[in-house]
Amino acid sequence: MMMPKKVKFRKQQRGRMTGKAWRGSSISFGEFGLKAMECAWITSRQIEAARVAMTRSIKRGGKVWIRLFPDKPITKKPAETRMGKGKGAPEEWVAVIRPGKILFEMEGVDRPTALAAMRLAAHKLSIRTKFVGREDSE
């Protein structure tokens, strides 16, 4: 699973997810992409599940780029613990996603194959997404 090798601070505040993505909103590497249409936290487990679904779908053809990285720690207190006694231990890592962000890119396969693979990946994520081609995003 994806997570940072080293972080300056182990715990972060949760923050807010407002506005649109202004970086990473166009296709840079591949021919086709999967674009987020709403705000969400996507966990490292979801990213890995989507990656596996996509790569198995295209078999050995094509190349896949993952354009998101889970760099935000989410903490959780143990079950049946009383309030107080500090912030919980880091439980999982998430990527903060805003609308317009390209999540995955792909090249080396034809459009119908890429669409089918991206659709499988989209079902593994907890947000609405849209399939885009390089000519669509510019």
Curated annotation (Swiss-Prot):
It comes from the Bacteria. GO terms for biological process: translation. The keyword Ribosomal protein applies. Keywords: Ribonucleoprotein, Ribosomal protein, RNA-binding, rRNA-binding, tRNA-binding. One of its GO terms (cellular component) is cytosolic large ribosomal subunit. The keyword Transmembrane helix does not apply. InterPro entries: Ribosomal_uL16, Ribosomal_uL16_bact-type, Ribosomal_uL16_CS, Ribosomal_uL16_dom, Ribosomal_uL16_sf. One of its GO terms (molecular function) is rRNA binding. Binds 23S rRNA and is also seen to make contacts with the A and possibly P site tRNAs. Belongs to the universal ribosomal protein uL16 family. Part of the 50S ribosomal subunit. This is Large ribosomal subunit protein uL16. The lineage of its organism: Bacteria, Pseudomonadati, Acidobacteriota, Terriglobia, Bryobacterales. The gene is rplP.
